[in-house]
Each structure stands twice: as structure tokens, then as C-alpha cells.
A protein has these predicted regions:
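C-terminal alpha-helical cap of glycosyltransferases
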Residues: 302-321
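A donor-sugar binding/catalytic signature common to diverse glycosyltransferases
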Residues: 70, 76-82, 222-265
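Active-site and donor-binding regions of nucleotide-sugar-utilizing enzymes
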Residues: 6-146
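Acidic, amphipathic alpha-helical patches
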Residues: 99, 178, 224-225
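Catalytic donor nucleotide-activated moiety binding site of glycosyltransferases and closely related
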Residues: 31-45, 182-221
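Extreme N-terminal starter segment of soluble prokaryotic enzymes
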Residues: 1-6, 156-157
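Conserved catalytic-core segment of nucleotide-activated headgroup transferases in glycan assembly
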Residues: 14-26, 138-206, 268, 303, ...
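Catalytic binding pocket for nucleotide-activated donors in carbohydrate/polymer assembly enzymes
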Residues: 103, 239-303
Length: 321
């Protein structure tokens, strides 16, 4: 008898996180359906099943419900599984990272590496009502596959992706610098903003710049996936968790006013230092790359393409043992 699984989508960036898991569920001969919150865009493919009501979910009777977001409906059938929507990089620089907030929604947490597993194991011992399994992140499976298809760009490609957090985003501060570099340097650009980015005035400025410059591609959806990251040579960002994702693809990262800087990235605090940092990143200095790879391993310990398989095994272990 086929097992039924459900994906709970409350944020648009859930789609690229969940699809590798969907592939593994189907590979095992089981079934998966999607439940999408009303205020979340529906970005399903034709072959993906959409349950549009609570009654449909009840009739479907999933054995497990997976959510990359911070909450889930506790009255849905099945084990509630947290997959996370990023890595615990503590972008706000707080003493307490809200990545580790236990809200009482989940039975299982599927952690990624030592930076998430160790704190959640402590929380498991403290609360006792959930289990923690280090599986790796489902989305990381796509990065493993994508690395085999790294393009060789004729000109350096810079991907600019900023966080949506208002007091951290670099977007208002870097516009003039990016505008100048687009016109002066022999680089191509991709610009992408987080789906939650809400400053429409700033967004409009970047869109207008992209429309006026042939060497800029504006990525409308804001969903940064492995293919988009792999198309670039360098990531320019601030404190977004996409930083770790770029590094998983061996892409050096330049940040503006990063809240947790370190030797794994090229962080600048002045706009006039951005150009030199990008040039250095393009050259891929050996020490930077070594530090970057060590940093990635702390966050994602399982870059083997099998994280989705381990997630399903963890659910089976929780249910049957």
C-alpha cells in the first residue's frame, strides 16, 4: 500500500526545498500532495497534486506533513516534520537565534549539520516532546546535482541577492554602486530579491536599472534555486541564508555589512570597497576558498545528494520505533 505524504506551504521559498523530497517519495513508489496557504503563490507543476481544502487533507490521510516554514496545522493527520527554510546564520546578530525557537508545532526536526543539530539535541533533551534527526537539508540535494553542470561564463557573472530584513538589507545602500559597476565593469549581473522584500520604491529602482542595461537580468520570482546560483561566478549579498547555498556550489561571496562576518567571506562596510572585493572573489584566492568550504561543512554535513532519503528514513524511524 502506498504511503501518503503532505507538503505544507506557507512561504514561496518552500517549493525548491520540497521538490527534491517529492522526487524521493515518488522514487520509492509513494504519493505526495501539496496544501498551500491562501496568501502564498501557487507555483505547482502540472504533475503535482494540490489539496485545496482541509477536508481534502483529512480524506487524504497523510502519514507525515512536511513544512519548511515556522508553523503547521496541528489538526492535520500525520507526523509533523520541520525541514527549515535556511541555515542558522543568525543574520540579525542576536544572542538568541530564532532559528532555534520551539513553538510546539513539530514532532520531528530534520537538522542539517553541527550548527543546527547540537542546539536542537539540547532542546530535545530539555522539552522531550519531539525527536531530532540529522538528515541534511532536502534542498542541498539539488546543489549536489547542479555542481556537475557548472557553466563556464565568457564574462564574470555577479548575482546580487539581498535579504528582506529592513535594518539589514543592503539594497538601498548599494544601488548607486551597482549602477556604476554595471556600466563600468565587463561583468554580467543577475539581480534577485527575496519574495518578502517589501520596499517597492527600492525594488522599482532596480527593475528600471535592469530594463535599461543589457548586462542585467532581473529575476522576477525571487526564488533563488541551485541553477540560478550556479549560473553566477560570485554572490553579492548582505546577511541572507542564501550565502551558505552559494558556498555549497563553491561560489565565493562578497557581503556588505554582514552581521556575522568571518574568514569564509569577503565582507565590506563601505560601498567603495565593493568593487575590489568582487574582483578578489572572481580570482578565487585559495585561502578564502578553503575557509569557505570548512564553513559550509559546519552547516551542511551531508553534501551527498541523499538528504531527502534520510528525511524519509527519519520519519519511518519515528513512526515505527
Amino acid at each position: 500500500m502506498k504511503k501518503h505524504y503532505l507538503f505544507f506551504v506557507s512561504v514561496a521559498y518552500s517549493y525548491p526545498i520540497l521538490r527534491p523530497l517529492q522526487d524521493e517519495i515518488r522514487r520509492r513508489g509513494d504519493e505526495v500532495a501539496w496544501f498551500i496557504e491562501p496568501d502564498c503563490p501557487v507555483l505547482l507543476n502540472q504533475d503535482e497534486r494540490w489539496l485545496q481544502s482541509v477536508q481534502e487533507v483529512m480524506d487524504y490521510q497523510p502519514i507525515a506533513v512536511f513544512a519548511p516554514g515556522n508553523y503547521i496545522y496541528d489538526f492535520f493527520p500525520g507526523v509533523k516534520v520541520s525541514l527549515f527554510h535556511g541555515y542558522p546564520i543568525n543574520k540579525r546578530g542576536d544572542e538568541k537565534d530564532d532559528h532555534f525557537s520551539v513553538r510546539g508545532w513539530f514532532d520531528v526536526y530534520c537538522t542539517q549539520g553541527e550548527t543546527s543539530t547540537l542546539p536542537f539535541k539540547e532542546l530535545e533533551r530539555k522539552y522531550g516532546f519531539f525527536k531530532v534527526y540529522e538528515t541534511g537539508w532536502c534542498k542541498a540535494d539539488t546543489f549536489v546535482k547542479e555542481r556537475a553542470h557548472t557553466p563556464h561564463n565568457a564574462r564574470p557573472v555577479v548575482l546580487y541577492s539581498s535579504t528582506f530584513t529592513k535594518n539589514i538589507t543592503s539594497a538601498p545602500h548599494l544601488f548607486d554602486t551597482i549602477k556604476r559597476l554595471v556600466r563600468e565593469k565587463n561583468w554580467d549581473w543577475i539581480i534577485s530579491f527575496h519574495p518578502k522584500f517589501s520596499d517597492m520604491e527600492v525594488l522599482k529602482k532596480y527593475k528600471e536599472l535592469a530594463a535599461s542595461c543589457p548586462n542585467i537580468t532581473f529575476h522576477e520570482s525571487g526564488l533563488v534555486d541551485a541553477k540560478l546560483l550556479n549560473s553566477a561566478d560570485v554572490l553579492l549579498s548582505d546577511a541572507s541564508s542564501v550565502i551558505v547555498e552559494a558556498m555549497m556550489l563553491d561560489k565565493p561571496v562578497v557581503t556588505y555589512c554582514n552581521t556575522m562576518p568571518g574568514a569564509h567571506l569577503l565582507n565590506v562596510t563601505e560601498t567603495d570597497a565593493v568593487e575590489g572585493a568582487i574582483e578578489k572573489a572572481i580570482s578565487r584566492p585559495a585561502e578564502l576558498m578553503e575557509q569557505m568550504r570548512a564553513y559550509v561543512h559546519k552547516h551542511e554535513a551531508h553534501l551527498d545528494g541523499e538528504s531527502s532519503s534520510r528525511v524519509l528514513d527519519a520519519v519511518n524511524n519515528y513512526i515505527w520505533y
